[in-house]
Amino acid sequence: MSRALRIGLAGLGTVGSQVAESVLSGVIPGVSLSAVCARDKTRDRGVDLSTVRWVDHPNDLAEAGDVDIIVELIGGTGDPAAALIDAALAAGKSVVTANKALLAARAMHLAVISEASGASLAYEAAVAGGIPVIKTLREALAGNKITRVCGI
């Protein structure tokens, strides 16, 4: 049996706390929560994080040996979210983000880092209200020539 994919989670707001709860409760098989980072360790998030390692700075997740993939749910176009994603991709760690603003501002920059390191940048949740349109375009419609996608 292969070991679980070890997640480093940055941001424990509404979405981040739900992700943590889902992983810790086993709803997502084959995944474990190795480390988390948030501004306030003492805030009640409605999920028991006592068994999870806390790091002081988001970039610590990118450097952690017990983290395979980063889930960035901090938000915003600047640091600490931007620095975390840059550091994680440069270190060869794949990143999952729902950060529309950061992707709009830095997508090309992040694509260059991702390509150079071989790490993936997954952002499906940031597009089309979370509808799996990116996967559909890449996989199910790969044989078609799509010239434009429009949305509101």
List each language-model region with its residue ranges:
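Hydrophobic Val/Ile/Leu positions in short beta-strands of Rossmann-like dinucleotide-binding domains
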Residues: 7-9
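Glycine-rich Rossmann-fold phosphate-binding loop(s) that bind the pyrophosphate
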Residues: 12
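NAD(P)-binding Rossmann-fold cofactor-contacting core
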Residues: 25-47
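Rossmann-fold NAD(P)-binding glycine/threonine-rich loop
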Residues: 80-86, 90-91, 100-137
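General beta-strand structural signal in soluble alpha/beta enzymes
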Residues: 54-56, 71-72, 96-98, 121-125, ...
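N-terminal Rossmann-fold NAD(P) dinucleotide-binding loop
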Residues: 16-17, 81
